Amino acid sequence: MASNQKTIYVYESFRSTEPNFLGTLFVENVRGRESYSFEYDADWLKSSANYMYLDPDLQLYAGRQYPTGAKNVFGLFADSSPDRWGRLLMTRRERILAEQEGRKPRKLLDSDFLLGVYDETRMGAIRFKLDKDGPFLSDDSKTPTPPWTSLRTLEEASRQFENDESGLEQKWINQLIKPGSSLGGARPKATVLDTKGNLWIAKFPSKHDDVNVGAWEKVTHDLARLCGLDVPESMLIDFSKYGSTFLVRRFDRNGAARIHFASAMTMLGKTDGASAADGSSYLELVSFIKANGAAPKRDLTELWKRIVFNMAVSNTDDHMRNHGFILKADGWHLSPLYDVNPVPEGDELSLCVNEDDATISLDLALEIAPYCEISTKDATAMAADVLKTVRDNWNRLAAECGLSRSAQEYMRPAFSLALE
């Protein structure tokens, strides 16, 4: 039986700007199928005896540990891996390299995708090496993170790639791979640096768009801000006739310092695709915050308001990957809101609101308010405020984002709860 093992050295940069050796990830490859195990570094365990766990499958003790259930890889490392867009780009890059080197393209495995993300822009604060004395992977000093001024060219490159994967030059493939994020699905995107050295994610128009997705994401993003929800800085720029580019500042960085991010999928021990269909619920997020949150009262209120807001804008893609947590010195906090888009035909959320119902219904949201330690009186007032804010501002914000009256009428059903 053909078998070989890859040893990956794992570091974290969330306790200080200097990386700390976290442990060793072992990848066993048997006939093209990979299995994973991980072992914490003994010194890291000693210095982190009272530290929050990073993954429910990785308890704070010595010895090898393995993913549980149907999971092939630990969620901690899945969050550091590229999304579908990133995988498409890496697969294309491998074909280009194979052609240049006169060989057949390799089939890329999960560990190849994990190590293929650029360290400089990798999501969160987990980092990887194949040699303890070597560079953090992936390293690419020849292709630095593109500046803000390259956005127009990057949008054009993303459009070329969507239209013809085989026609894009390697240098642009490398630039588009830069996001290094497990967030965002297959949407074309790139990471860019602003003039102050801050990382931003640029989400470009896609040939598959039926509406101006970037503009509508900006509308809902600004509505969330007006509702008092925690959202990162954002902006909207039009570079072409194909739609708007939505830019959002990365919340996993504070200057040069990395902030560890974990998806709710990881922290709740879920697998990709977990949804209301299998009983995945907001109540599980509530339980996690109560048990592990550094600021549970604040985060429970924020989470509940997000549920109402998701209903108010019909954000039906609110699955476990689209909720997350960031790790600070005092523990886990609900991350800023991200990936919120209105859906005109939406009538159910991706997650159950209570144990078994995902219906967009204010009564359902009010039903679980006590679990979030919010009184019925306060919940009713907060919900009314969210709905009024959406009702009074969605048209105005849509117009400011360049969306026509017909585009607004098309999207109007997404705001039905607020307009009732």
Model-derived segments and their meaning:
Residues M1-M320, G324-E420:
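Phosphate/dinucleotide-binding and metal-coordinating scaffold of catalytic cores
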